[in-house]
């Protein structure tokens, strides 16, 4: 049992729980920063000014979702 305690202590010293991302660290909780990082449709490099849209199908996804330009 003491070996298990030593192993647990070593693991907690090497990987403290504070190093793990918590729910409060997610970008969802910081909308102001999200808005600064967000690119509007008109400024998107694939946005066609004449057609007012991107070419379809969407050439790329951001975090598994379509870019804002393609969603219109």
Curated annotation (Swiss-Prot):
InterPro entries xrefs: Conotoxin
Residue numbers of Leucine amide PTMs: 71
Expression by tissue: Expressed by the venom duct.
Disulphide-bonded residues: 53-69, 54-67, 58-70
Keywords: Amidation, Cleavage on pair of basic residues, Disulfide bond, Neurotoxin, Secreted, Signal, Toxin
Family: Belongs to the conotoxin M superfamily.
GO molecular function: ion channel inhibitor activity; toxin activity
Main location (coarse class): secreted
Record protein name field: Conotoxin CnIIID
Stated role: Shows a paralytic effect in fish.
Signal peptide feature range: 1-19
Cellular component GO terms, alphabetical: extracellular region
Cell location: Secreted
Note: Found in injectable (milked) (IV) venom.
Residue stretch(es) of the prosequence: 20-49
Entry's free-text remark on domains: The cysteine framework is III (CC-C-C-CC). Classified in the M-1 branch, since 1 residue stands between the fourth and the fifth cysteine residues.
Highest taxon of source: Eukaryota
